[in-house]
UniProtKB/Swiss-Prot annotation:
Co-factor binding comment: Fe-coproporphyrin III acts both as a substrate and a redox cofactor.
This protein's encoding gene: chdC
Protein name (record): Coproheme decarboxylase
Keywords linked to the UniProt accession: Heme, Heme biosynthesis, Iron, Metal-binding, Oxidoreductase
InterPro entries xref list: CHDC, ChdC/CLD, Dimeric_a/b-barrel
Known EC number: 1.3.98.5
PANTHER family: COPROHEME DECARBOXYLASE (PTHR36843:SF1), HEME-DEPENDENT PEROXIDASE YWFI-RELATED (PTHR36843)
Known function: Involved in coproporphyrin-dependent heme b biosynthesis. Catalyzes the decarboxylation of Fe-coproporphyrin III (coproheme) to heme b (protoheme IX), the last step of the pathway. The reaction occurs in a stepwise manner with a three-propionate intermediate.
GO BP term (any one): heme B biosynthetic process
Cofactor(s) needed by this chain: Fe-coproporphyrin III
Family to which the UniProt record says this protein belongs: Belongs to the ChdC family. Type 1 subfamily.
Length: 254
């Protein structure tokens, strides 16, 4: 390996469950045309799907969560984690073939995989056998009151090209960046998913918290860190409130 190749060494990643963020807008006009009984049948069918998907979580083979999105970008977000891309696709198809999907309009989606990089160092032994690492690669999505999702890239322009930095430079920058996130431990749960080759951005960031203001505080503080200020490129932000299965009838009531 040449000196230049060593300098620009690619970060190695540990990869966990595959992730789908599926954002939908309700076609309320069409939904209102249904009778109350018809709507109840559709809600029951969707509730059954959620229960079916929940069985995988009980067996440790995935996780899912549902949030009502605030603003006009979407009405709700379904986030799914599964061991394989095929299983992710199967769930996507199950929902698309459901009666409820007939009254939704796709608003946005994001395909990625839960990721940990070697920027923060690694311990001895097989990391996939480390309980702490496994908990991060194969997480059970929390029942937090609020969610925030956004995609992001590392900048590749002029002197601000992340991919032309040496491994040592990137590792030092990410260590400082990570310390900010650690300051929100217990307040915000963060799941980073890699999407290079899977979607239009390079990473997806999903934040969970019981205090919605923590999203604003965390993202704002990170804007002053060099990783974000100099090298970060961000897509649209989506924020929402947890939509428990028991709340579906009220959410869909018209």
């Amino acid at each position: 390996m040449s000196e230049q190749q060593k300098t620009n060494e690619a970060a190695q990643t540990l990869d966990g469950w595959y992730a789908l963020h599926d954002f939908r807008t309700m076609d309320w006009s069409a939904w209102k045309m249904l009778s109350s009984d018809e709507r109840q049948i559709i809600i029951s069918e969707f509730t059954g799907l959620l229960e079916k998907w929940g069985a995988a979580q009980k067996e440790g083979n995935g996780s899912h969560t549902l949030y009502s999105i605030v603003g006009q970008k979407a009405d709700f977000m379904l986030m799914i984690l599964r061991p394989t891309m095929e299983e992710l696709n199967q769930i996507e198809l199950e929902f698309n073939k459901s009666k409820l999907a007939e009254y939704t309009i796709p608003a946005y989606s994001y395909v990625s995989v839960v990721e940990l990089s070697n920027y923060m160092g690694s311990g001895d032994g097989d990391p996939y056998e480390n309980p702490q690492v496994r908990a991060r690669l194969y997480p059970e999505l929390p029942d937090a009151k609020y969610v925030c999702f956004y995609p992001m890239d590392k900048r590749r322009s002029g002197d601000d090209n992340w991919y032309m930095l040496s491994m040592e430079e990137r590792r030092n920058l990410m260590r400082s960046h990570g310390m900010i996130g650690r300051g929100y431990a217990g307040k915000v749960k963060q799941i980073i998913t890699g999407s290079i080759g899977f979607d239009d951005y390079e990473w997806g960031v999903t934040l969970f918290s019981d205090d919605v203001l923590q999203f604003k505080k965390l993202v704002y503080e990170m804007r002053f860190d060099e990783v974000s200020a100099r090298y970060g490129e961000f897509g649209s932000f989506f924020v929402g409130n947890r939509l428990a299965k028991e709340q579906l009838p009220a959410f869909l009531h018209v």
